[in-house]
Amino acid sequence: ITTLLGFRYDPEGFVRYAFPWGVKGTPLERVAGPRTWQLDEFKRIADHLQTDIEKARIGLPGSPLYLAISSGRGIGKSAWLSMLDLWVASCWIGSTSIVTANTETQLRSRTMAELGKWHTMSINRHWFEKSSMSMRPTKWFADLVEQQLKMDTQYYYVDAQSWSAENPDAFAGAHSQIGMMVQYAEATGIPDPIWNVTEGFFTDLAPLRLWIVISNPRRNTGRFFECFHKDRGFWQTRYVDSRTVEGVDGAVYQRIAGKYGENHDVTKVEVKGQFPTTGVDQFIGRTVAEEAAAREVTEDSGAPLVMGVDVARKGSNESVILLRR
């Protein structure tokens, strides 16, 4: 226990210690360690926690880390989330982690199934019991935490939560003064009301507050998209091209790019981890609009006066009227 608690501010150190990298006869016998992009993000989290420690030394409160990652297929997203789950549960005893996804099927058969795989390989797997939709401390460990640390364990878990856009309040209610992490898998498919409710999870001044959203970027609208655009001032972001990731078959991705072309939306979404240029209900693609906005126009007093009108129909969009000659 003491050794693992020493990795409280070092997720990479925990991951390297807790799993059997390169050990013969295990699922990781041919894997030397986490992938480069995963290590980069572990470091980002560690750096954020160190910054919070420095803030605490001068009497300032820490802050949540909001992290959005947009990627192509097959980079190891679920594996990375699972490693994070086990680090938080093991090194932040008493913490609460909430995991959700775009569908309950994704949540149950992909995200939480992956957590089960990593839990089975972990050096401290005897600390926790894993079910299809949660991971909680075993009775002996819960008793130890309650007796030695005088800490209630009712909210000490990694819990998979499904959601309903019509009843978002059912998703609310989780709080922790020890540590709070929320993960969105395939975040592009999670509706705005759930994002709104999640913001309330981080009101307690816990020393660990992480909101991790990760997805293939299937839509160029919605809150996941806005993490990289309108709301990018609040989020730390990253794009991951699948072809840059070790341990995957690069030929598969090159075949997709060769078939559709580098700038096709299929290549952007499935390989590059970039948002599609055109949405399903979008007549003019975003790239075309951005190029037009950046284009230098020479005024011609003899040309006809042209009015352009873009009528907003829903959400926070605004109607625009523009005159040009």
What do these predicted regions represent?
Residues 1-309, 321-325:
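Phosphate/NTP-binding elements of NTP-utilizing enzymes
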